[in-house]
A protein has these predicted regions:
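Extracytoplasmic/cell-surface-exposed regions of Actinobacterial cell-envelope-associated
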Residues: 16, 22, 97, 119, ...
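Short, structured beta-strand-loop surface elements
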Residues: 59-128
Length: 152
């Protein structure tokens, strides 16, 4: 995919800043393609661990998508003052199953927000990108007639 032309006022974030924003975000969106080829989005709380995103889950849609090996994405965003930002991690996910890696996750304080058994750990690795931009007032989007006969 080719890079889009720069947009005035949009700051492309460096990798360090992207990881810091991922660390600070209380939750993110895990994006997968299900078995029927449809996109699905799951809000999850997470932790940054060893250059990856880690979250807990139970058996079900997220774990099935991970097992399929399809590409995934993980997205966080926010607003700070008059600046908005977005960070996306695009890559692959795997269920943490090796004993050494499972023991290592014990040091990551990651308690699921939703009740129920969330005994599975998923790790997402990939390419990171992010951007920050000024929040535009709603008046910018006001659209009037473009000329005679144009819809209002």
């Amino acid at each position: 995919m080719s890079a889009a032309a720069p947009v005035p006022g949009v700051e492309v974030l460096d990798e360090r800043t992207c990881w810091e924003l991922l660390r600070q975000a209380p939750y993110g969106r895990f994006v997968v393609v299900d078995a029927d080829g449809r996109p699905d989005v799951f809000p999850v709380n997470h932790a940054v661990d060893h250059g990856s995103v880690l979250f807990r889950t139970a058996d079900g849609g997220k774990l099935a998508a991970v097992a399929s090996g399809s590409p995934v994405a993980f997205e966080v965003d926010g607003v700070s003052g008059d600046l908005a930002w977005s960070v996306v991690l695009r890559g692959v996910a795997h269920q943490v199953t090796r004993m050494a890696e499972l023991l290592d996750t014990a040091s990551v304080h990651l308690a699921p927000w939703q009740a129920g058994g969330k005994g599975r750990f998923v790790r997402v690795r990939g390419d990171l990108s992010g951007r920050r931009f000024p929040v535009t007032g709603s008046g910018w989007w006001a659209v009037g007639p473009a000329g005679p006969g144009a819809p209002a």
